[in-house]
């Protein structure tokens, strides 16, 4: 962690060399998601509810998912841009260093400008928490925190999976956007509004359902069974990260340099 902190400090100083650009990008990241949230607001303004879900209930999920995505984009941006390291041959240099390749790729890129998106998501989340009809307890507050952490782990895991594919494809695949940007757009709504096969895929394969739908049921007092099970449900995101890292190690062992 100490080494990772040094990576962050170096990257922060590098980005602050162009302060005007940094702040403009941060402001852009703050305002761009407002168009998405405005669409959500007008949707509920027109129809009132969707499959029994009220506006502030969905806004709570919106805030959680977009905050998780913003944090994952900040931390795992190196994996999102990993194909450049493979194409240029820079990954060869990482392999000869006595440090984890995961740590080095994490430290190769960090998007501090995503703090704008993070702040916007936090504002929406605080507003939704204040307005949603829920009896808040310490366990429910912890569940909300676990939802954010788990969502971050899931998005980071997807970035790692897509980066690992570059060991075979060299160039990054645009199909990854289906699971990153597409996953963010899909998971900002409770999963039960979709077809059953979609719900099952995003519960048992990529466990977004364990981040938004199931714990949200507990927070809104609509769950059945012990509350602590729903509280721990978001931790499935941490488990999702394990096979992603194993696949990364599998790819590293089969890496062949491009010769650049």
Segment roles from a protein language model:
Residues 1-260:
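Hydrophobic transmembrane alpha-helices and immediately adjacent juxtamembrane helices
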């Amino acid at each position: 962690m100490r080494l990772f902190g040094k990576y962050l400090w170096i990257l922060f100083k590098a980005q602050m060399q162009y302060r005007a650009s940094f702040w403009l990008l941060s402001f852009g990241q703050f305002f761009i998601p407002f168009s998405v949230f405005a669409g959500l607001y007008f949707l509920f303004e027109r129809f009132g509810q969707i499959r029994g879900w009220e506006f502030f209930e969905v806004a709570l999920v919106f805030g959680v998912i977009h905050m998780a995505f913003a944090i994952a984009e900040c931390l795992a941006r190196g994996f999102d841009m990993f194909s450049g390291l493979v194409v240029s041959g820079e990954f060869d240099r990482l392999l000869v260093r006595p440090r984890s390749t995961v740590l080095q790729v994490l430290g190769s890129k960090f998007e501090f400008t995503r703090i704008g998106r993070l702040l916007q998501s936090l504002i929406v989340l605080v507003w939704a928490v204040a307005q949603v009809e829920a009896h808040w307890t310490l366990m429910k507050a912890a569940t909300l925190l676990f939802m954010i952490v788990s969502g971050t782990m899931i998005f980071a895991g997807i970035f790692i999976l897509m980066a690992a594919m570059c060991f075979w494809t060299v160039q990054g695949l645009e199909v990854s956007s289906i699971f990153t940007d597409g996953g963010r757009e899909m998971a900002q709504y409770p999963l039960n509004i979709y077809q059953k096969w979609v719900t099952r895929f995003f519960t048992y394969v990529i466990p977004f359902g364990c981040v938004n739908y199931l714990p949200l049921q507990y927070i809104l007092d609509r769950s059945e069974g012990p509350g602590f099970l729903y509280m721990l449900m978001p931790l499935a995101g941490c488990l999702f990260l394990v096979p992603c890292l194993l696949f990364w190690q599998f790819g590293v062992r089969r890496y062949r340099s491009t010769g650049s």
